[in-house]
Structures are given as structure tokens and as C-alpha cells.
Amino acid sequence: MTDILNLTYEELEAFMTAELGEPRFRARQVWQWLWQKCARSFDEMTNVSKATRARLAEKAVITWPEVETVQKSADGTTKFLLRLADGALVETVLIPSASREGTLRITQCLSCQVGCAMGCTFCSTGTMGFERNMTMGEILGQVLVARAHLGDSRPDHPILRNLVFMGMGEPLLNLNEVMRSLRTLNDEFGLSFSPRRITVSTCGIEKGLRELGESGLAFLAVSLHAPNQEIRKRIMPKAAHWHLDDLITALESYPLKTRERVTFEYLLLGGVNDGIEHARELVRLVSRTKGKLNLIVYNPAEGDPYDAPTPERILAFEQYLWSKNITAIIRKSKGQDIKAACGQLKASELQRGTASAGADAPED
């Protein structure tokens, strides 16, 4: 059976004509039902004939991720633990904000892999190891779940406004499925997200970086987190295989649209990378590119190897960057009371499962 959410529009058109003998326009109808109207069954597609719906049901399925757990923070952040068809667990987070007019807007943080191979020492997902890549249908299934949860059914006035590939996994290590997802997101008859409302975040992987830039399908964010190669090797051991200086050199010629800048994500770890000496090194790096900085205050979970920086060090770090004409914004951590940082909810769920299994095990 073909999972129809894994098909690009061109693939769906070929499937409808070759497998079902339908005219090409039928693919457009099905496509709009899948992505604009969030249909979970072929029976919902009321402008498609019953005979065609029956043939679709014989040869294809529509597989959404199943919602395993939902947690809502006091600040409105909502985190989902989703179960995929093979039982794998991934996370997605909805982060609320308000427009200047006070209208609710939601940013969704998307996962693209089950687990992660990068092994970043500050990240809960990194401690889980890598299981597999997610398919396009699984990646975009997170968006469908979010829209259904929000009752977001008006493409002309969407509640879900922005998407960030900053969840579980490294996007450039699942480049093919991420690029397929971006094309479907950009499709005006599909999910219809402007590239300016999508950001792909990478640890700094050489392979695929240029292809992403030349596609023009999304903005780029780089999870920098280290002002020099020594710290990069310590806290981001896999990413450090591509030397920090080489990464910045590649970003100097990264294709950018008018008024577009690379966003550097910098996680402030207490006593590790949050000193003025680190800020000086960071200025030298970022000033080589057309970029801006998002400063993220570390949100430690129980048993984590790092501490949050002090408010004094955070302020001094930010002020130094501004004094050197580097745009730096402190990004407030949301959802701290529901383990909203990447991988924390899944890690908690796995620990609970292990504890339950141990409690139920027969005694020797």
C-alpha cells in the first residue's frame, strides 16, 4: 500500500494516472484534500467520485502520526509526543506569540529524524542516538496534527504562521526528505507556506548546505553554540568534523535573498561559552558573514552536565555583542515546565517506560 502523504505532487499525479487510470486533474483535487483540508480518509473527499475513492482505498493509505502525549505549558507552549506507524516516537512543539495587532500566531518546531546522530552534549535528543530518517509524510504529518489541534482551517488567515526545523534530528543528514517536504510546504495548492516563514536549522553540515541555499525554499539558521573549534569539539563532537573556520568560510558565500541574513543560534552554557572572551571570538566569526545572533539561555534538565548562565553573564554577553554592532537577541526559553527543549519529553517518556518495565519485572 502506498502512503499517499509520502508523494510529491508530481508523484501523486503519476500514481493517479498510471495506477488508477484517472485524469490528471484528479490529482489536484486529492492533493488539496490532503494538505489544505487535512483529510484523514478518502471518504472525506466529497468532490471525488465514490468509485475513485474506493480504488484509492484499495491501493493507498493516509497515515497521520498518532498523538501519544500532549503537554501544555503555563506560557501557552504545547508539546506533542507523536507515535509514527512503526512505533517510533518524535516530538513537535507549538510556540505561541502575538502580532502587533494582538492576533495569535503559532510557530511550530518540526522534527526530521527519529533520534539524532550528532551527539551534541547539551541536547537530550543527542543522548538517544540515531534510529532513522523520517519520511516526507511523517515530517509534514506533524503540521497536519498541529492544524487539526488548532482548528486551523482557513488558509487565508492561518494560525500556524511559521515553521522551524529545529526539533529532533539534523535536517541536512535527511536532505532528500527535507527538500521534498519544503517543496510541498511551498506549493500554493498544498500547505502554501512562504519560504520566508520556514527556517531550517543545521549544526553545520557541509553536504547539502549549498543545495538548500540555492533552492530558496527556506531561511537558514546555524546552530553555532561555540566561538572556537576547541569548544565546538567538546560540546558538538560530530559537527566539529567540519572545522568551524571552514563552516564560516562556506557561509560567506551562502546564497541569500535581499534583506535575508543567516541566523546563528548560540546556546549560553554557564561557565563554558558565556564569557566576554567568548563573545570577542564570536564577534570575529559572525562579522565575516551577513548574520544575526539568537542567544538562547540553557534550560537544564535533571542530570544534565551543564548549568544555566547567570543573569549578569547573559546581560554582559549581549551588551558586548551590541557594542560591536552585532545584532543579538536573547530568545526566551518557553515551555520549561513541560520539558519543551528538544528531546526532553521523549527522554522522560522512555525513562518512565523503563521504570515501569523494571517495576513489573518478576523478582529473581
Curated annotation (Swiss-Prot):
It is found in: Cytoplasm. It catalyses: adenosine(2503) in 23S rRNA + 2 reduced [2Fe-2S]-[ferredoxin] + 2 S-adenosyl-L-methionine = 2-methyladenosine(2503) in 23S rRNA + 5'-deoxyadenosine + L-methionine + 2 oxidized [2Fe-2S]-[ferredoxin] + S-adenosyl-L-homocysteine; adenosine(37) in tRNA + 2 reduced [2Fe-2S]-[ferredoxin] + 2 S-adenosyl-L-methionine = 2-methyladenosine(37) in tRNA + 5'-deoxyadenosine + L-methionine + 2 oxidized [2Fe-2S]-[ferredoxin] + S-adenosyl-L-homocysteine. The keyword Disulfide bond applies. Residues 102-337 form the Radical SAM core domain. Belongs to the radical SAM superfamily. RlmN family. Keywords: 4Fe-4S, Cytoplasm, Disulfide bond, Iron, Iron-sulfur, Metal-binding, Methyltransferase, rRNA processing, S-adenosyl-L-methionine, Transferase, tRNA processing. Reaction proceeds by a ping-pong mechanism involving intermediate methylation of a conserved cysteine residue. One of its GO terms (biological process) is rRNA base methylation. Specifically methylates position 2 of adenine 2503 in 23S rRNA and position 2 of adenine 37 in tRNAs. m2A2503 modification seems to play a crucial role in the proofreading step occurring at the peptidyl transferase center and thus would serve to optimize ribosomal fidelity. InterPro entries: Aldolase_TIM, Methyltransferase_A, RlmN_N, RNA_MTrfase_RlmN, rRNA_lsu_MTrfase_RlmN/Cfr, rSAM. Its EC number is 2.1.1.192. Disulfide bonds join 109-342. Its main location: cytoplasm. Binds 1 [4Fe-4S] cluster. The cluster is coordinated with 3 cysteines and an exchangeable S-adenosyl-L-methionine. It is an enzyme of class 2 (transferase). One of its GO terms (molecular function) is rRNA binding. The active site is at residues 91, 342. It comes from the Bacteria. S-adenosyl-L-methionine binds at residues 169-170, 201, 223-225, 299. [4Fe-4S] cluster binds at residues 116, 120, 123. Its cofactor is [4Fe-4S] cluster. It comes from Nitratidesulfovibrio vulgaris (strain DP4) (Desulfovibrio vulgaris). This is Dual-specificity RNA methyltransferase RlmN. One of its GO terms (cellular component) is cytoplasm.
